[in-house]
């Protein structure tokens, strides 16, 4: 079933020659000084992060990846499907971590190989409210079935720079002892195509200052 879902997603994305007039496609990339994901430095290197998406009505199918420039460390190549109704979005994401070995073939799924992690998530974001929320749960590929919850508060603009604060907590693979804990507190700035974040992980007692640019 899992394999069928994402095979269908791939076929739908590749069928762009028959895109209806109401549909839209998009692509882009980011370059970041470090790839910090939910309070953890994933690659310990500058990373290039391309993405592409196909939107039709309330459905979006897309791919997003992160590639470290230090010779293949912490590569990630994800697929996702999302459905949005009003301020609520429901998504399934396939996190795939290719290391280019015989044990990380794309169609290997399950809790035992750790090459794919499948996540279900729900998010809430209203244009008339400064707060957005996301809850996520790993239902395959993660023996801990880790749970994540995150909130972002938009503080508005200062000197033409968007300012927000993000707080995230999780358990399982997100924490040092698998128990629920606060693992990410960040201050985020964005101006034009540039962005920066200062992130504290209270659980690991580590901090990061990252900078990036959108293309």
Segments (PLM) and residue ranges:
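Cleavable N-terminal export/targeting peptides
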Residues: 1-26
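Outer-membrane beta-barrel proteins
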Residues: 22-215
């Amino acid at each position: 079933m899992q394999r069928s879902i994402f095979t269908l997603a791939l076929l739908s994305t590749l069928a762009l020659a028959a895109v209806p007039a109401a549909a839209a496609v998009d692509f882009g990339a980011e370059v970041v000084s470090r790839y910090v994901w939910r309070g953890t430095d994933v690659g310990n290197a500058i990373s290039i992060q391309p993405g592409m998406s196909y939107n039709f009505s309330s459905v979006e199918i897309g791919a997003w990846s992160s590639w470290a420039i230090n010779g293949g460390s912490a590569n990630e190549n994800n697929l996702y499907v999302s459905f949005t109704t009003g301020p609520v979005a429901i998504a399934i994401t396939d996190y795939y971590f290719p290391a280019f070995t015989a044990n990380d073939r794309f169609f290997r799924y399950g809790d035992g190989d750790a090459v794919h992690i499948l996540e279900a998530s729900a998010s809430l974001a209203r244009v008339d409210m400064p707060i957005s929320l996301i809850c996520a749960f790993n239902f395959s590929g993660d023996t801990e079935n880790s749970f994540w919850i995150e909130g972002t508060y938009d503080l508005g603009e200062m000197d033409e720079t968007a300012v927000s604060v993000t707080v995230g907590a999780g358990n399982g693979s997100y924490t040092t002892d698998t128990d629920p804990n606060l693992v990410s507190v960040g201050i985020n700035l964005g101006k034009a195509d540039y962005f920066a974040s200062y992130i504290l992980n209270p659980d690991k007692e580590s901090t990061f200052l990252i900078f990036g640019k959108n293309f």
